[in-house]
From Swiss-Prot:
This is Uracil-DNA glycosylase. GO terms for biological process: base-excision repair, AP site formation via deaminated base removal. Excises uracil residues from the DNA which can arise as a result of misincorporation of dUMP residues by DNA polymerase or due to deamination of cytosine. One of its GO terms (molecular function) is uracil DNA N-glycosylase activity.
Length: 237
């Protein structure tokens, strides 16, 4: 793809890991991205507080390069409370109380694999091993859940899934809840494993369909079957 000087300048301003930047270039130069960039600029001009901090917006992609991805855990949008969101789906900064969904995830992990329940909710260790912790929408206004939906992020993360779908094989996609499952309809089930369950939020999980889903052991079993190093799900103390 031959780029103009203007396009190269636009790409240089995107703080994104190189393998992702190369693969997502058509989208990064699309009208969707222009519109999204304008929206975020307007939000900052209006002095809105946006989570996560700008340097962490692309954390999921920056920590887990394209050729390192083994697993994708798809979330909806970032936590909207202070100091929570760190750019990884379901993850929170160290020192922040565990959100209810993450408590339930840790409970299921303990039941499934006997992994001790972590006292902190920073999932960076998973991301560093190849777990792409991807929200569908990558930003949110403080205290306003879902406030940045339908501004272009959904199309961006669809493009991320399409790149993985087309360029990689034997990835495990973990889709909790109807929202993630709808977004995951584009995944080729002949090349990849798709695991579905209810959402880990208390409202959904307590209705049934999340506890006992055993996605962590099923993920590692599939990876091992395909000669891929399994994930060490235990977080550091």
């Amino acid at each position: 793809m031959q780029l103009t000087e203007q396009q190269q300048d636009k790409l240089s301003k995107v703080q994104l890991e190189e393998s992702w930047k190369r693969s997502l270039t058509p989208f990064l130069l699309s009208p969707y991205m222009d519109s999204l960039r304008d929206f975020l600029f307007q939000q900052k001009q209006a002095q809105k507080t946006i989570y996560p901090p700008s340097k962490q917006i692309f954390n999921a992609l920056n920590i887990t390069p394209l050729d390192h991805v083994k697993v994708v855990i798809l979330g909806q949008d970032p936590y909207h409370g202070p100091n929570q969101a760190n750019g990884l789906s379901f993850s929170v900064q160290r020192g922040v109380a565990l959100p209810p969904s993450l408590r339930n995830i840790f409970h299921e992990l303990h039941t499934d694999l006997g992994v001790p329940v972590s006292r902190h909710g920073d999932l960076t260790k998973w991301a560093e091993q190849g777990v792409l912790l991807l929200n569908s929408v990558l930003t949110v206004e403080a205290g306003q859940p879902t406030s940045h939906q339908k501004q272009g992020w959904e199309e961006f993360t669809d493009a991320v899934i399409d790149v993985l779908n087309e360029q990689r094989e034997h990835i495990v996609f973990i889709l909790w809840g109807a929202y993630a499952q709808r977004k995951g309809q584009r995944i080729n089930r002949e090349k990849h494993l798709v695991l579905t369950a209810a959402h880990p939020s208390p409202l959904a999980a307590n209705r049934g369909g999340f506890f006992g889903c055993k996605v962590f052991s099923k993920t590692n079993q599939y990876l091992k079957q395909h000669g891929i190093e399994p994930i060490d799900w235990q977080l550091d103390a």
